[in-house]
Amino acid sequence: MKQNFNFIQSIRLSTRTDDDFCSNNAIRGILWNIVYFPCDLYADCKDNNVEKIKEYIQHVPISQINHVESNGSTSLHVAAYYGFNELVKLLLKNGASRSIRNKHNLTAYEEARTSTIREIFKRFNDEDRFLSNIDINYEWILVCEETFLQREHFRQQLLKTFARDSTEDLSTKFDTVYDRIKEHYIILFEQENLPQRQQLLIDWFFMNASIEKNPIWIVKAYTSTTDFYKILNRHLAMYVLEYFHPTLNKSIDYKLVNCLIDFVGIFIHSDGLDKLNYVGQCYRGMLMTKDDISQYTIGSQVMNMTLLSTSKQKTIAEIYAGDGQSKLMRQTPDFKLIHFSTVCTYTVRNKHTALDIHQISEVTDEEEILILPFSTFRVTSMKQNDPKKNGILIELELEECCES
């Protein structure tokens, strides 16, 4: 048996394998598991060989699915360009990256032949990316006077971990950070019951970050259609403050905490992300209870512990907040609303508070602006709309506190 396996391993397949040799389906299946050429997938996509691709795509490494051909395009580009709906779905399901640009500087979404194809690229069953529908305290800390001082303290502490003026070479430091994340954080995803292809795709993003010494790959991982952003934000909300606590807690995994600080340091202090700094307005949807609303008084200050996905398009936030769906909101037995659809308008004034990531996002149509942790905003306006109009019920405006 071992002899036969070694014999099969020694066979080098050409792009077009001899038909007689591969007439045996079992042998062909074994060979596909051992050697596979990206150009085969690209050619099969161009020919729309969906059934053939279904037979082997689960065995194709993510790096080969996202291989850039000599003409500058990926398999996803060619499938979208020719309008092959089922094939686009299959590639996306198996880890095709949406953000790769070809030699024309276009993503597969931008080259899509039809509006139907473009719809496939949009997120589905991911209603809380631009929507805060969990416990507000899970995401925000509300303080009256000291919020901005805490923000300054937290960010200065981060500089000690990921300093711009560090004498250590940036690429060396990035390797150290990546290795720590890989060893102590990415491995946790095995406990999250993620689909295998999601795990492989997340690992692919971080592998590229390490190879290229480029933190943009970590941003891409966050924007991907995996559950990476949900898990990271949950951990940030639960544990990131432990890093700043003066006493140790034996129940806390400080390797996890240090990895979370690495993530925040990369997003805030990495020179590689400076070109993405954003100043301006952005929008996010929220589902709020009466108790939540009562905390957002004019003049109150809030500081976020997590990464917040917002959009330059107000309509995106309105859709996620349930605009026009008030009749479907959670209600009491006597038909009084429990959840109120809310749209927050954030005015970002300082650098290193938000990143404009829509050009590198896996879903460019969302025009995503990412608000970074330890950012402080003051509530400047609250408007309550007529519930009979079945629109957004609460409109909040928040303006970032000035840097000292």
Feature map (PLM): residue ranges:
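Charged, surface-exposed interaction regions in soluble eukaryotic proteins
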Residues: 66, 71-73, 77-85
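Residue-level marker of regulatory loop/turn positions in helix-turn-helix DNA-binding domains and
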Residues: 33, 45, 68
